Amino acid sequence: MDWNRVEGNWKQVKGKVKEQWGKLTDDDLDRIAGKRDQLEGKIQERYGIERDRARRDIDDWYNRQGW
């Protein structure tokens, strides 16, 4: 997985992230700024799930994007 691609294109990607994780606010997404660890933490917080689950969910989402 090449997360640099997500981070480098965050302005374009954050809409897709918002579609997947609608509980994340625009402010959350602006603060995350493409940083995977921050995205994991915010998903964990907003959805009340374990960090490992957030990590797996992000991996699944990323793989479905076809990048």
UniProtKB/Swiss-Prot annotation:
InterPro entries, per database record: CsbD, UPF0337_stress_rsp, YjbJ, YjbJ_sf
Gene3D superfamilies linked: YjbJ
Similarity section: Belongs to the UPF0337 (CsbD) family.
Domain of life: Bacteria
Name of the featured protein: UPF0337 protein msl9551
UniProtKB keywords: Plasmid
Gene source species: Mesorhizobium japonicum (strain LMG 29417 / CECT 9101 / MAFF 303099)
Classification of source organism: Bacteria, Pseudomonadati, Pseudomonadota, Alphaproteobacteria, Hyphomicrobiales
Pfam families linked to this entry: CsbD
